[in-house]
Amino acid sequence: MPALACLRRLCRHLSPQAVLFLLFVFCLFSVFVSAYYLYGWNRGLEPSADASESDCGDPPPVAPSRLLPIKPVQAVAPSRTDPLVLVFVESLYSQLGQEVVAILESSRFKYRTEIAPGKGDMPTLTDKGRGRFALIIYENILKYVNLDAWNRELLDKYCVAYGVGIIGFFKANENSLLSAQLKGFPLFLHSNLGLKDCSINPKSPLLYVTRPSEVEKGVLPGEDWTVFQSNHSTYEPVLLAKTRSSESIPHLGADAGLHAALHATVVQDLGLHDGIQRVLFGNNLNFWLHKLVFVDAVAFLTGKRLSLPLDRYILVDIDDIFVGKEGTRMKVEDVKALFDTQNELRTHIPNFTFNLGYSGKFFHTGTDAEDAGDDLLLSYVKEFWWFPHMWSHMQPHLFHNQSVLAEQMALNKKFAVEHGIPTDMGYAVAPHHSGVYPVHVQLYEAWKQVWGIRVTSTEEYPHLKPARYRRGFIHNGIMVLPRQTCGLFTHTIFYNEYPGGSSELDKIINGGELFLTVLLNPISIFMTHLSNYGNDRLGLYTFKHLVRFLHSWTNLRLQTLPPVQLAQKYFQIFSEEKDPLWQDPCEDKRHKDIWSKEKTCDRFPKLLIIGPQKTGTTALYLFLGMHPDLSSNYPSSETFEEIQFFNGHNYHKGIDWYMEFFPIPSNTTSDFYFEKSANYFDSEVAPRRAAALLPKAKILSILINPADRAYSWYQHQRAHDDPVALKYTFHEVITAGPDASSKLRALQNRCLVPGWYATHIERWLSAFHANQILVLDGKLLRTEPAKVMDTVQKFLGVTSTVDYHKTLAFDPKKGFWCQLLEGGKTKCLGKSKGRKYPEMDLDSRAFLKDYFRDHNIELSKLLYKMGQTLPTWLREDLQNTR
């Protein structure tokens, strides 16, 4: 108070002129403070006058000094979040959003996309105290900045609590302010700029793959760039660039030398402002360096949980050695260049070796100069790796006789032995990838018989495009690796005649598709051809420049391995890919073209009865077989009427094995095949596998009270002399604790787990559309089968219908409905069906009623959502629950 009184007395003694003078001094001081705040970072980025120039003749960028000490930020807590990325996009079809997703998919990172809410609900961020997302990405950072207060606070608190970072993109448009402060942040944006000469801040802590030793000379794509500016210590520039013209950025001053300053196009927020780490991009991902830094940003903000190791394995296959018309083959100088380039590449890739695939029939079929090239190549036989094609370069799927295929291979092997070519590499490639996928069984058997093949590769699994989805699998003891293209094909042999111009090839190499293939794949097998190594030798040009570019801009450790070791490394990294996923060959034209013409997709079933077990599936199987247009599978010698293909070891026998259970259709329009395997229902793998091979199939499931189903399974096991079922009562089985023996727990699971109906149907709904699935009332099927069969026929859409009221009759001795034959006789199921056994004890009934209560409630909700009628037993159960 005394101080305030003194101030009042002082003011009374000041003249108006003195007050104005003091105001002027205060304003001048404010201007100096503002100038320091605005320009401090920018001046810190200017190259020092005495800095030594780099190899490219450009002064190295100087990162700004932090004005405040670093404060502790919540560390990434990998154990507290799932390795899932939440991507907020403008729309499902926006280009930048798709590019972000493509990089995540290529890296095999799991993600979830959401339309960015301006207002409205935010996705659930936690589940039982665990964070659902390890990283948040905003296609448009303004959608994050302008979130309503509730959602913004919700998201920010989540990021702070779980150590989750944010990546955002700012894409200027014609309505963007030239200069503005990002709302709520000590960060200024200057937009709609043209930039050039991009460099990397070597002090940036997020750099991992990116090597900061180069300057990308030239104009950056687009004129809608945004640069970031701040004097707060939380911001660290990552990428820096100059303005294209000599004009200064508006509002940054008219200093004549200011245009030469470096401006941040990507900035890292260290989290010192609000505890959240972020990486902000001043444009989209069209600029290749943004893609590289984006990969590093994902790695840094997730504590390297979402990152690949720095090791990259590269194998370059040269297909069609000795194959090719005159004028496209290698001559003596080309062979020498191949050998010299291999040695040159070994300076960056230890023991790099070209892998040569040959068809011996075409040896010495070129010009004299090309034949001399063949001879020189064979004189270098020990310098390269070798693998066989077919002798006459024929497509294997055209050979239906395995012995003929083996004869062709034997001719190629004889040629190899005669010319000293090693035959024990264990790797082969089929011409045009024929027979590898879709699988031609004869090819796999002949490969093993003649060559002892252990590894092959293809670009066709699961599909040619998009390339980022290509995967590996193992079939019949042969490891199949994904193969990549590199922009070179049999017809691309001259640099100046490259499609789109030579600059297109350079673009693919220097930060383009080929560069990204290596960046985002730990293992890359590249397909090239003999013709790419003659004439302008584009194959050598491509890989020399690619390796140089990778060495200049990345910290990747380039390596190579022979094919068998490479395959072992691949499945060590991607062990989840060992099991194949068979698809309908007729759904992909390329697959159909390399699939045997003797095979037809019409042999696949159009209906699956999936179970679960002990609900009446065998009766339904019998009733469907009575329809003239419906045909069931042939019986299995092991599993009787059930094929059990999609859920177990039979799946690895392939689709040829599966099709053998169905006849070749006489009428593809009316013939309707179906199969019943009751253990498909609760299988974790069957829905996905079935949807891949039979995407248009109809699915039938029969449900009875899960308590009755559990008891029926227990009695079924007793009837088959299961020692565990004979030893323990039903009540002991279903109430067994976690310390019970493994065999007892296994029986308990088979009694109880299939009764989690909603859980299993949800899994099938994730693979098939709801209108492809029909859930039948098992109790009604037992009492009124004709009524149920009318529903089934309508669901299947069969052209002719059967009146089951006239074809079914109740057999009082059996106690269920049977097929009515001529003369009033009936054909019923075997002795094992309809077995009589004691009633379930009341304690077990009460236990199961309580055990399945929540499952049944979820089932009722799910069936309502699917638009299907609730089974009578479920309605009764829910009424009694109330």
From Swiss-Prot:
InterPro entries: Heparan_SO4_deacetylase_dom, HSNSD_N, NST/OST, P-loop_NTPase, Sulfotransferase_dom. Pathway: Glycan metabolism; heparan sulfate biosynthesis; Glycan metabolism; heparin biosynthesis. Adenosine 3',5'-bisphosphate binds at residues 614-618, 712, 817, 833-837. Residues 599-882 are annotated as: Heparan sulfate N-sulfotransferase 1. Residues 40-598 are annotated as: Heparan sulfate N-deacetylase 1. Gene3D superfamilies: P-loop containing nucleotide triphosphate hydrolases. Residues 1-169 are annotated as: Sufficient for localization to Golgi membrane. Keywords: Disulfide bond, Glycoprotein, Golgi apparatus, Hydrolase, Inflammatory response, Membrane, Multifunctional enzyme, Signal-anchor, Transferase, Transmembrane, Transmembrane helix. Glycans are attached at residues 231, 351, 401, 667. One of its GO terms (molecular function) is deacetylase activity. Residues 1-17 are cytoplasmic. It is a single-pass type II membrane protein. Disulfide bonds join 818-828. It is found in: Golgi apparatus membrane; Golgi apparatus, trans-Golgi network membrane; Golgi apparatus, cis-Golgi network membrane. It catalyses: N-acetyl-alpha-D-glucosaminyl-[heparan sulfate](n) + H2O = alpha-D-glucosaminyl-[heparan sulfate](n) + acetate; alpha-D-glucosaminyl-[heparan sulfate](n) + 3'-phosphoadenylyl sulfate = N-sulfo-alpha-D-glucosaminyl-[heparan sulfate](n) + adenosine 3',5'-bisphosphate + 2 H(+). The chain crosses the membrane at residues 18-38. Its EC number is 3.5.1.-, 2.8.2.8. It holds the Pfam family HSNSD-CE. Essential bifunctional enzyme that catalyzes both the N-deacetylation and the N-sulfation of glucosamine (GlcNAc) of the glycosaminoglycan in heparan sulfate. Modifies the GlcNAc-GlcA disaccharide repeating sugar backbone to make N-sulfated heparosan, a prerequisite substrate for later modifications in heparin biosynthesis. Plays a role in determining the extent and pattern of sulfation of heparan sulfate. Participates in biosynthesis of heparan sulfate that can ultimately serve as L-selectin ligands, thereby playing a role in inflammatory response. Monomer. Interacts with heparan sulfate co-polymerase subunits EXT1 and EXT2. Belongs to the sulfotransferase 1 family. NDST subfamily. The presence of 4 different NDST enzymes in mammals, as well as differences in their enzyme activity suggest that some initiate heparan sulfate modification/sulfation reactions, whereas other later on fill in or extend already modified heparan sulfate sequences. This is Bifunctional heparan sulfate N-deacetylase/N-sulfotransferase 1. It comes from Mus musculus (Mouse). The gene is Ndst1.
